[in-house]
Amino acid sequence: MKGDAKVIEFLNAALRSELTAISQYWVHFRLQEDWGLAKMAKKSREESIEEMGHADKIIARILFLEGHPNLQKLDPLRIGEGPRETLECDLAGEHDALKLYREARDYCAEVGDIVSKNIFESLITDEEGHVDFLETQISLYDRLGPQGFALLNAAPMDAAE
């Protein structure tokens, strides 16, 4: 089914955002793991994998609309140099994604592409959950301080390899 060209553009922009998030969350997972923040690292890894699912849905929709998914472009990665900064970087990426997805959802509704609109609605719901989680973690970091936050996110000694 031939899709609206601008809808396909929005889907490719969303794909770029998701591919960027996959890489960024994965690098943060590895950094956090290296810093001994096993619980924080586990969550970043889960987020990266969730973003892979988003990318897969977007690719399938682009192909259904007879478009060409562009997996060669990424937005610049924002890589934090410490625990709080990784959270801030991820939060900035989520805010950027939400802005794009809301604009895309509205355009899809205007042109009557309800399936693409629903995909963007689903992405918005997931990204809002990510924003809430990240804002909560930043607040915890600020209230507990670096040491308290590290203790909260460290794995128990008996879980060490």
UniProtKB/Swiss-Prot annotation:
Cited SUPFAM superfamilies: Ferritin-like
EC number of the protein: 1.16.3.1
Residues binding Fe cation 1: 18, 51, 54, 127
Recorded GO CC terms: cytosol
Alphabetically ordered keywords of this record: Heme, Iron, Iron storage, Metal-binding, Oxidoreductase
Keyword Metal-binding among UniProt keywords: yes
Highest taxon of source: Bacteria
Domain annotation Ferritin-like diiron: ranges: 1-145
Residue numbers binding Fe cation 2: 51, 94, 127, 130
Residues the record lists as binding heme b: 52
Recorded GO MF terms: ferric iron binding; ferroxidase activity; heme binding
Catalyses which reaction(s): 4 Fe(2+) + O2 + 4 H(+) = 4 Fe(3+) + 2 H2O; Fe(2+)(in) = Fe(2+)(out)
Gene3D superfamilies: 1.20.1260.10
Cofactor(s) this protein cannot do without: heme b
Keyword Heme: yes
Known role: Iron-storage protein, whose ferroxidase center binds Fe(2+), oxidizes it using dioxygen to Fe(3+), and participates in the subsequent Fe(3+) oxide mineral core formation within the central cavity of the BFR protein shell.
Family of this protein: Belongs to the bacterioferritin family.
The protein's name in its UniProt record: Bacterioferritin
Gene name for this UniProt entry: bfr
